């Protein structure tokens, strides 16, 4: 359904039109149902006849703020109407002390007792429980400090390259060996790499060995040098998107809002999008563009446009104020934005503090 684009006409909406529009949106956010003129007349403080209300609703529909989902139905806000409501009417207040303490207690307990991943999982679970949407955390995999690398020969043409970090993480990869490589050359390449990578991060180790290119050539024969380059390729990983880790909790909450077949199709698209690593990388980029909480409503968010979902998201940062991840709530367009915005904002600030 196409609507007239929202323009400067909205600036000149009279108080009565704004009041009626606000009540339509608030009723929709409360129960997800269209509201008719008779129900509106009971909700409004001022006394207006259903006929007068219908005339105002017609004007609001012409502006693209509301629509009728089917014949003889009441009216619901469009995505553009929800955006206008969020920008013009919504007041995101302070998070209630009870919810603030609840978030802080659960996230801090997880942070003290378990790994970073466990405490990020808890952050997504808390957001899900409090919002009744799906809580998500997008984390960039932090570089570990390297302990050693080893080449284990499998046959004449292949070896298993094993990379171990000080944190106990192990990465294995089968590599192709140049023809004629001896056991002594495998050992020589392993010793050279370990002498220069131990105690460094992946990026630091690559930079260190790149600076030693001439020394490497002088110290190693051609086949051993080839193995060193193979080890460097292993340090490079599989690209930036491989480092992005998505944590989602509360998917079942989204099923509570399903009212029709099209809602199930919307959720199918959403779950497909959440499994796409490229989408997650783009989402992190979008979050990095803003300094605080961002709200994407329906098709405004190109990543989830097919699902028609809304996303409230905020970045969290390291001690150098670099964005290292994002967290938020995703759900139907009738999210309680005024409540969820401060919730997401506070959780992002708390996670940033605990990661420093």
UniProtKB/Swiss-Prot annotation:
One of its GO terms (biological process) is negative regulation of DNA-templated transcription. It comes from the Bacteria. The keyword Nucleotide-binding does not apply. This is Heat-inducible transcription repressor HrcA. The gene is hrcA. Keywords: Repressor, Stress response, Transcription, Transcription regulation. Belongs to the HrcA family. It holds the Pfam family HrcA_DNA-bdg. One of its GO terms (molecular function) is DNA binding. The keyword Transcription applies. PANTHER family: HEAT-INDUCIBLE TRANSCRIPTION REPRESSOR HRCA. Negative regulator of class I heat shock genes (grpE-dnaK-dnaJ and groELS operons). Prevents heat-shock induction of these operons.
């Amino acid at each position: 359904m196409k609507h007239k684009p929202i323009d400067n006409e909205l600036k000149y909406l009279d108080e009565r039109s704004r009041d009626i529009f606000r009540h339509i949106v608030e009723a929709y956010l409360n129960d997800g149902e269209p509201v008719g003129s008779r129900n509106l007349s009971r909700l409004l403080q001022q006394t207006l006849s259903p006929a007068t209300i219908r005339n105002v609703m017609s004007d609001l529909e012409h502006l693209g703020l509301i629509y009728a989902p089917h014949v003889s139905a009441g009216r619901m806000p469009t995505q553009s109407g929800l955006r206008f409501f969020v920008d013009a009417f919504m007041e995101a207040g302070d998070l209630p002390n009870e919810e603030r303490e609840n978030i802080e207690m659960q996230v801090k307990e997880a942070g003290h007792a378990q790994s970073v991943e466990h405490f990020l999982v808890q952050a997504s679970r808390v957001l899900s429980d409090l919002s009744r949407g799906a809580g998500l955390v997008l984390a960039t995999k932090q570089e570990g400090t390297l302990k050693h690398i080893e080449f284990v020969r499998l046959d004449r043409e292949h070896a298993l390259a094993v990379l171990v970090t000080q944190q106990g993480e192990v990465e294995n990869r089968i590599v192709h060996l140049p023809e004629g490589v001896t056991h002594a050359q495998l050992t020589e390449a392993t010793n050279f790499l370990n002498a220069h990578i131990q105690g460094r991060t992946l990026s630091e180790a690559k930079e260190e060995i790149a600076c030693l290119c001439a020394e490497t050539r002088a110290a190693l024969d051609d086949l051993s040098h080839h193995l060193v380059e193979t080890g460097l390729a292993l340090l490079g990983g599989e690209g930036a998107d491989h480092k992005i880790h998505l944590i989602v909790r509360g998917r079942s909450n989204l099923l509570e809002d399903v009212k029709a077949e099209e809602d199930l199709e919307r959720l199918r698209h959403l779950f497909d999008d959440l499994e796409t690593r490229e989408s997650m990388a783009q989402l992190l980029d979008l979050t990095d563009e803003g300094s605080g909480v961002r709200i994407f409503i329906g098709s405004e968010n190109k990543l989830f446009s097919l699902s028609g979902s809304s996303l409230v998201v905020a970045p969290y940062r390291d001690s150098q104020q670099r964005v290292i991840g994002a967290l938020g709530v995703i759900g139907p367009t009738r999210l309680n934005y005024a409540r969820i915005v401060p919730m997401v904002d506070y959780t992002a600030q708390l996670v940033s503090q605990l990661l420093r």
